[in-house]
Amino acid sequence: MKLLLARHGETDWNARGQIQGQSDPGLNETGRAQARALARRLEETGVPLRRLYTSPQKRSAETAAIVGACLGIEAEAVEGLREICFGVWEGHCWEEIAALWPHSYEAYAADRLRSRPPEGES
């Protein structure tokens, strides 16, 4: 069995450097083009795909729907694939986070596994 992992296409938040977490922006036009390019690349590889799983978030579900439509596979949303919650940091870029929440930012930068954003999860 082979497991292929792919990241969702671009959103406007990605393009602006904003943390998304569990916020739910959809793909922008670049992101939709990236999803179509991914589908073409997967077709070219000839690797048979039997299942397609996605996070239930718009950006991931939309990417998977585009890929699935091209490959003739229906995407299945899995709650366990949802992005972690970045709490009050969501919608902000890293520079803003460092300025607004310096202590929690420094702790997170030093050890992402043992620290968490304010009102977020680790």
Identify the meaning behind each predicted range.
Residues 69-122:
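Phosphate-handling substructures
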Residues 3, 7-74:
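Active-site-proximal alpha-helix that buttresses catalytic centers in soluble enzyme cores
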Residues 1-3, 121:
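Solvent-exposed, charged interface segments at domain starts and junctions
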